[in-house]
A protein has these predicted regions:
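Glycine-rich phosphate-binding loop of ATP-dependent small-molecule kinases
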Residues: 1-205
Length: 205
């Protein structure tokens, strides 16, 4: 599994082609491509070489100086919360569950956004799960278990303050997950989210 960001200052089609080429080469193996050394069993395929420009992501283009003008903010917030409240009630009546995932830099406003969202919701119909370092109980199981156990029942919602994406973000960067573990996590995360969607859960990230 590989990710190709299509909102970056390089040709996403070219990057997708390079990524596919690397994946095909890694799966064909040494027989079809004798000029390439076979990768050790169980090791992830090396990422394709990228230029400095190609390595840029959408986060490199974020304008950290942008601010929302205070004029009309409260009115717009109240209107949005009212609409959200109506949608939440309708989802509860129709037994539609929802999972909302918040990821972002530290102090980027995740907690504030969650508070503004839950202010419009019946507290009996949702849970907020703050994801921190795993406990000993969680370490003894697959890393997705700590999220599976909070998947909401029909008509209810779960908001995750940080999520399973930590496996390929902080755990990868800080060295808490081995390369084979975080490489495998891309497919595991996709499968997990597909199972949620197949069950009729509304997933917002």
């Amino acid at each position: 599994m590989a990710w190709v960001d299509n909102d970056v200052p390089y040709d996403p089609d070219l990057m997708a082609g390079r990524t596919l080429l690397e994946r095909f080469r890694s799966h064909l193996g040494a027989t079809a491509l004798p000029h390439r050394a076979a990768a050790p069993a169980g090791s992830p395929a090396p990422p394709p070489a990228m230029s400095q420009e190609a390595s840029l992501t959408i986060l490199d283009r974020v304008d950290l100086k942008k601010k929302l003008p205070p004029e009309g903010y409260e009115r717009r917030l109240e209107k949005a919360q009212g609409r959200l409240g109506r949608l939440v009630r309708a989802a509860f009546e129709k037994k539609r569950s929802s999972v909302v995932v918040f990821e972002g830099w530290d102090a980027s406003g995740k907690g504030g956004n969650i508070r503004r969202i839950t202010a419009a919701m019946d507290p009996r119909t949702y849970r907020v799960i703050s994801v921190a370092a795993p406990t000993d109980e969680e370490k003894a199981r697959h890393y997705l278990w700590r999220f599976w156990r909070h998947v909401p029942r029909a008509g209810y919602g779960t908001l995750y303050d940080r999520s399973w994406y930590g496996r390929v973000l902080v755990e990868r960067v800080e060295g808490f997950a081995r390369s084979d573990e975080w490489s495998r996590a891309y497919l595991e995360i996709n499968d997990f989210e597909q199972q949620l969607a197949a069950h009729g859960i509304v997933l917002a990230k």
